[in-house]
């Protein structure tokens, strides 16, 4: 999982990427390609 300060560019890496908020942190998840995971912070 990548940790970045801005998720805007990581959201555009794949069309199936989606942004979710869990436990106060923002994540990018992709159910089809698991390697496109990222966390903001």
Swiss-Prot record:
User: Could you tell me the superkingdom of the organism this chain comes from?
Assistant: Bacteria
Cite the Pfam families for this sequence: Ribosomal_L36 (PF00444)
Please name the InterPro entries in this protein's record. Answer: Ribosomal_bL36 (IPR000473), Ribosomal_bL36_sp (IPR035977), Ribosomal_L36_bact (IPR047621)
Q: Keyword set for this entry? A: Ribonucleoprotein, Ribosomal protein
Q: Name one GO biological process term.
A: translation
Entry's Gene Ontology molecular function annotations: structural constituent of ribosome
Q: Does the keyword Ribosomal protein apply?
A: yes
Q: What is this protein called?
A: Large ribosomal subunit protein bL36
Annotated organism of origin: Rickettsia canadensis (strain McKiel)
Q: What is the lineage of its organism?
A: Bacteria, Pseudomonadati, Pseudomonadota, Alphaproteobacteria, Rickettsiales
Give me the gene this protein comes from: rpmJ
